């Protein structure tokens, strides 16, 4: 997972083993500033079935025990453990592989083809590059993973249906649908 600071790296190093023990993966670590900083950790199940509230609560309790000893954030802060949501951030190459065929927004740390923001359909991963099929373009655009600072799935009906199906809650059929 890509992080934005050495502090995020330290938090991630503490959180990942705890997540692994619970069959979870850390999707993103962020510290939100304010009067009282908020440490936000997004997690998901490693089996792809989606994290539940109970999983978040267990992970939060386990992290609190570790963070109480290691103290990765100076001063008082609030710990928030949450699901990445349906329109989740993509932070690792395996995320881009897993969500191939879905629409995504990507922001880069530098210009590519004269811009930093892209939107299109994920077209796979090859040699550390993320493939993106964009409207009006004949060729797949290959973006170096290392240039990506933010990437997020776009909420679509197909994405919602895929999420429901993965959780075993596929769309209900009505009498005329059969």
From Swiss-Prot:
Keywords: Cytoplasm, Ribosome biogenesis
Chief localization: cytoplasm
Transmembrane segments: none
Source superkingdom: Bacteria
Cellular compartments annotated: Cytoplasm
Any one biological process term the GO annotation gives: ribosomal small subunit assembly
Keyword Cytoplasm found: yes
Pfam families named in the record: DUF150_C, RimP_N
Record-linked InterPro entries: Ribosome_maturation_RimP (IPR003728), RimP_C (IPR028998), RimP_C_sf (IPR036847), RimP_N (IPR028989), RimP_N_sf (IPR035956)
Annotated GO CC locations: cytosol
Family that this chain belongs to: Belongs to the RimP family.
Job description of the protein: Required for maturation of 30S ribosomal subunits.
The protein's name in its UniProt record: Ribosome maturation factor RimP
Native source organism of the sequence: Maricaulis maris (strain MCS10)
